[in-house]
Amino acid sequence: MKFNEAPSADGVWHHCHLLPAADPAQAIRDGAIVVEQGRIAWLGAFAALPDVYRHLPRHDANGAWITPGLVDCHTHLVYGGQRADEFAMRLAGASYEEIARAGGGIVSTVRATREADEATLFAQASARLEPLLAEGVTAIEIKSGYGLSLEAERKQLRVARQLGETYGVAVHTTFLGAHALPPEYAGRADAYIELVCETMLPALAAEGLVDAVDAFCEGIGFSIAQTTRVFEAAARHGLPVKLHAEQLSNLGGAALAARHKAISADHLEHLDEAGVVAMAEAGTVAVLLPGAYYFLRDTQLPPLALLRKHGVPMAISTDHNPGTSPTTSLLLMMNMGCTIFRMTVPEVLAGVTTHAARALGAADRHGLLAVDRAADFVLWQVASPAELAYWFGRNPCAAVVRRGRVFRKGEGWQR
């Protein structure tokens, strides 16, 4: 079903329970939502439904819980190919260096992405996006970073925009040119950062393809000084920044991100208290990525106690990518957030709604059920919202409303 052919959600949604935000204390049992012209006009207890809305068409939610649409705030969804062969090599004991020498690793994805045309990239990314939409995702971040040339990065970002237009999902694009060194710049990292800052970013920003700028600040990525150059270039174009930080080591990337008022710092397994304090003071969201932690069989947990102590908002995301987190299930990430990272159910609910929206700089658009917001919400056939994190391998989503259009399970609802 094409997005513009899906039925309208306008009318009164009733026979439901509402969770307007992640806090269970705000739940409304026997609630109702009124949608007019694709936006939420009213919500509350059904018994308090104003008379002015009682004549509108009714949508029976069949006892479902309704939450805000989910937000997947860190993905690398658009790329060529996949790396299952590399996964098998790793399981057989091959090191990262051995895989790279055999032509694997990120270079293989860069090669496949550069070789693919936009139609191919769109078809492959669509197959990854649709399972996320089927789990209630209504807003998603999509990074570039597998092109590593102006032409190929542009191609990734154009496809990301096309996905949003085709599926009616809110796509937030992030330019991640500073993801890795392309083969042609081996040993010349500073020269490549010059290209990123002075050629790629200005051109892509001028074309309206960039909503935010990211970098990979690690020993195997880019240094603090090089990342600083990327952030300064983003500032010249009025773009917010975010950062892959402290995943493999503590270089002080989170503190750097905070100094530049980054909207998020992501991964953070090796984050220390100084970095946590800096993030808290800057209002930077901690985006936790249990899929990559699991897939890499990591043992260093993010410092949850410190993040809680200093009041840093925590988001959860799939980090969908071919090398370290080839998952298309945000619900599974919620379960892993609880079982592996030891988060609470309210924390993971906030992590895929309100806090994930903050991590995109879009808290005014996503992550809450509120009057005057777009009608983006999900119907779940569960007895309690806790079931969203409890189950794994099961999708209890019955229907999704995206931009005021209804997509029901079993009716070609993903598209």
From Swiss-Prot:
Which subcellular locations apply to this protein? Cytoplasm
Sample GO molecular function, one term:
iron ion binding
- Recite the UniProt keywords alphabetically: Cytoplasm, Histidine metabolism, Hydrolase, Iron, Metal-binding, Zinc
- Where is Zn(2+) annotated to bind? 74, 76, 244, 319
Its domain of life reads Bacteria
Q: Where does Fe(3+) bind?
A: 74, 76, 244, 319
Q: Where does N-formimidoyl-L-glutamate bind?
A: 146, 321, 323
Give the binding site residues for 4-imidazolone-5-propanoate.
83, 146, 179, 247, 324
Q: Which Enzyme Commission number(s) are on file for it?
A: 3.5.2.7
An annotated GO BP: L-histidine catabolic process to glutamate and formate
Instruction: Give the reaction(s) catalysed.
Output: 4-imidazolone-5-propanoate + H2O = N-formimidoyl-L-glutamate
Hey, which pathway is this one from?
Amino-acid degradation; L-histidine degradation into L-glutamate; N-formimidoyl-L-glutamate from L-histidine: step 3/3
Which cysteine pairs are covalently linked by disulfides here?
none
Looking at the keywords, is Phosphoprotein present? no
Q: Name one GO cellular component term.
A: cytoplasm
Q: Which cofactor does it need?
A: Zn(2+); Fe(3+)
How cofactor binds (record note)?
A: Binds 1 zinc or iron ion per subunit.
The entry's family comment says:
Belongs to the metallo-dependent hydrolases superfamily. HutI family.
What the entry lists under NCBIfam families is as follows: hutI
HAMAP family in UniProt: HutI
The protein's role, per its UniProt record: Catalyzes the hydrolytic cleavage of the carbon-nitrogen bond in imidazolone-5-propanoate to yield N-formimidoyl-L-glutamate. It is the third step in the universal histidine degradation pathway.
Name of this protein: Imidazolonepropionase
Natural source organism: Cupriavidus metallidurans (strain ATCC 43123 / DSM 2839 / NBRC 102507 / CH34)
Q: Which gene encodes it?
A: hutI
